[in-house]
């Protein structure tokens, strides 16, 4: 197997960790987004809250961590690698995660699919909050996270370029590196990228946190070929691999884990993602057709490690393969009128192979015990989106019809009939943005989105770490959300801000219902996966920045509430209210800096009945961070170069986020005080 030693790559350098977060990691009002409307559009003219995020100047660890502290965003964590994006309180299957516009499909028992791309090869992350099913189908209830790698373009003359750099961090004794090389001409454009990362167990105020290190590498190749002025072919190849990833938040005793096994912890010795995509862009008449064929494979080794036996007692290998095709045609109907029509087809297959040792006291029988056999989910959808103006008001309206079918050869250990199910889903959205002045606009957005049940919810019968034996339900109805968002956006020079208030209602919420019955063999209480009552999530969020003399001050905040109407209690794992305050000084060249305080309130609104006591209150905390650096102009062979230093958790505060997984009262502490240094250059 190919392993890219990060130290070797770091000697070459890491793809220029993007410039100061003072400029980029905060919301970029007036920036371009390709995710919100399906084509390039100004965020100021988009009737939804959008965040454009880049990695901090001194780099970062995984993509999910970029969302932490941003308005309406958070990250659910079960370890250093497993950082799941949380959008307005919704996560995992309720959020669509994409790489270069291709959705990543995979069951998510532990870890985070957003981590299947190294930040060294990330150009930016576009986060569109609120319903997005019109363009992206199932799961886009909380929104969409699109991880975008650098694009490659044509040039009139043959040209060669690239960027390199390196990152070293103290808190996890980490080394990261990556490099990008581009070669372009009038008819061809090639980009090759490589990234590697090797991190040790990180240090918290309690000391080194066991099993938080891992190794990863990413390969990227993109090619464009211009067949004519009206026709371009595209190829996008990606491979990401991780080794020795542990999920400390999964550590459990009891709850179906035999006492002689001690503490059981989930880990992944190896996992990888591969993408093969072929695309075409063609001018047809007055419009443009874009179409793609792709295959994306996510392979994961999932193991349960016994502290008493000092070996794995559950071994599960699973590969989720998604084959897809999508196309859209964008054409103008007038000077200020754009219509998009499209179709989106994909099929995901999963066939886990699980072996378990369940013969006490030896626990060595290696019994085949697959949770399901040959699961399959197919989705076929068509959509239309219309953008036009009525006077000064810009309207974006769309609708989509999807048919989602699920089936498997076997559910659990015995059931082979009644597994097929098909549902039809209608999504729609209506947004309007109205200028109030030259720089200030108000917007409103009303939309409906949905989430079809995933494979585990449909087909898996097994014990889980919450102390219940979960029973899948292949006849689940999809969750359906209805959302309303009202907001303000102000751009230009001087004071800039965006403010949004939102309300989301989710009907046919998929969750486990406690029946009172127990499993006859292991004695665990049953939890049947069913469509329950509605849940609601509502809140307000915003961000702002403004010059203060030679400096720039910025702020961001989030406040939201979630209600579980079935159990008449707060919704499980809702992010706590928080406020971020920053001050810094930007510079095109020379010295730049930024300092930040992040204050997170106590979260005492917890689910007790739904979680069976596994969610507990989380104390509030305040952290201080800073970063500074120097931007050089031309330096030797580099057209530009930079140095950046990131100082994290300056007070060495012990805390954990409310979304941190783990036994109540014993959650994994966040990293302590640390320093990260990055060097980068482009040529």
Enumerate the language-model features and the residues they cover.
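Gram-negative outer-membrane beta-barrel transporters
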Residues: 334-336, 389-395, 404, 496, ...
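Signature of Gram-negative outer-membrane beta-barrel scaffolds
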Residues: 340-440, 463
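Periplasmic-side early beta-strands and strand-to-turn transitions of outer-membrane beta-barrels
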Residues: 162-163, 179-271
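Short acidic/polar hinge/loop motifs at secondary-structure boundaries
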Residues: 75, 103-131
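Short strand-turn segments of transmembrane beta-barrel domains in outer membranes
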Residues: 144, 149-183, 212
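Surface-exposed extracellular loop regions of Gram-negative outer-membrane beta-barrel proteins
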Residues: 241-243, 249-257, 299, 349-362, ...
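Outer-membrane beta-barrel signature, preferentially recognizing the C-terminal barrel domain
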Residues: 257-284, 318-320, 371-379, 420-435, ...
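N-terminal periplasmic "start-of-domain" segments of outer-membrane beta-barrel proteins
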Residues: 30-59, 84, 92
């Amino acid at each position: 197997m190919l392993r890219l030693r990060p130290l070797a790559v770091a000697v070459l350098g890491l793809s220029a960790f993007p410039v100061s977060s003072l400029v980029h990691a905060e919301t970029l009002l007036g920036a371009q987004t390709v995710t919100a409307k399906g084509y390039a559009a100004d965020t100021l003219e988009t009737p939804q809250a959008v965040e454009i995020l880049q990695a901090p100047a001194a780099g970062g660890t995984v993509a999910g961590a970029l969302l932490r502290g941003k308005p309406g965003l958070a990250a659910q964590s079960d370890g250093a690698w497993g950082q799941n994006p949380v959008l307005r309180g919704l996560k995992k299957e309720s959020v669509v995660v994409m790489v270069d516009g291709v959705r990543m499909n995979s069951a998510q028992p532990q870890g985070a699919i957003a981590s299947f791309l190294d930040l060294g090869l990330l150009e930016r992350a576009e986060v569109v909050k609120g319903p997005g099913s019109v363009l992206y189908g199932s799961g886009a209830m909380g929104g969409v996270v699109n991880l975008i790698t650098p694009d490659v373009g044509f040039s009139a003359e043959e040209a060669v370029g690239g960027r390199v750099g390196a990152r070293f961090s103290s808190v996890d004794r980490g080394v990261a590196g990556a490099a990008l090389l581009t070669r372009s001409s009038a008819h061809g454009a090639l980009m090759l990228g490589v990234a590697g990362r090797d991190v040790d167990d990180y240090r918290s105020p309690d000391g080194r946190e066991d099993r938080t290190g891992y190794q990863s590498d990413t390969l990227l190749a993109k090619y464009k070929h211009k067949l004519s002025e009206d026709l371009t072919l595209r190829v996008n190849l990606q491979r990401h691999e991780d080794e020795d990833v542990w999920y400390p938040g999964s550590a459990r005793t009891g709850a179906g884990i035999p006492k002689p096994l001690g503490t059981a912890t989930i880990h992944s010795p190896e996992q990888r993602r591969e993408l093969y995509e072929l695309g075409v862009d063609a001018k047809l008449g007055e419009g443009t057709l874009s179409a793609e064929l792709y295959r994306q494979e996510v392979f994961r080794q999932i193991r349960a490690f016994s502290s008493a036996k000092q070996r794995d007692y559950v071994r599960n290998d699973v590969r989720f393969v998604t084959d897809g095709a999508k196309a859209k045609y964008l054409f103008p109907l007038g000077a200020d009128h754009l219509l998009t029509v499209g179709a989106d087809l994909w099929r995901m297959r999963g066939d886990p192979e699980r072996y378990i040792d369940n013969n006490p006291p030896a626990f060595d029988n290696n019994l085949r015990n697959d949770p399901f056999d040959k699961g399959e989910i197919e989705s076929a959808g068509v959509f239309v989106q219309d953008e036009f103006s009525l006077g000064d008001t810009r309207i974006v309206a769309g609708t989509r019809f999807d048919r989602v079918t699920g089936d498997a050869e076997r559910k659990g250990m015995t059931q082979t009939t009644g597994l097929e199910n098909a549902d039809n889903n209608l999504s729609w959205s209506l947004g309007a943005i109205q200028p109030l002045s030259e720089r200030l606009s108000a917007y409103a957005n009303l939309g409906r989105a949905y989430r079809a049940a995933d494979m585990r919810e449909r087909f898996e019968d097994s014990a889980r770490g919450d102390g219940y034996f979960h029973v899948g339900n292949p006849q689940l109805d999809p969750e359906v959300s209805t959302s309303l968002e009202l907001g303000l956006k102000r751009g230009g020079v001087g004071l800039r801000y965006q403010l949004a208030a939102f309300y989301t209602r989710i009907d046919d919420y998929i969750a486990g219902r406690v029946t009172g019955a127990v499993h006859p063999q292991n004695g665990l209480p049953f939890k049947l996966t069913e469509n329950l009552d509605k849940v609601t999530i509502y809140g307000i969020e915003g961000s702002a920045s403004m010059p203060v003399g030679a400096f720039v001050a910025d702020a961001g905040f989030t406040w939201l509430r979630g209600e579980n109407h079935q159990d008449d209690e707060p919704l499980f794992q809702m992010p706590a209210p928080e406020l971020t305050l920053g001050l810094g000084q930007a510079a095109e060249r020379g010295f730049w800096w930024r300092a930040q305080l992040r204050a997170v309130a106590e979260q005492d609104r917890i689910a007790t009945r739904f979680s069976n006591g596994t969610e507990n209150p989380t104390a509030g905390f305040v952290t201080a961070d800073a970063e500074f650096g120097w931007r050089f102009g031309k330096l030797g062979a580099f057209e530009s170069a930079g140095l950046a230093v990131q100082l994290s958790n300056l007070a060495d505060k012990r805390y954990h986020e409310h979304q941190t997984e783990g036994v109540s009262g014993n959650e994994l502490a966040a990293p302590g005080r640390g320093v990260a240094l990055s060097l980068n250059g482009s040529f």
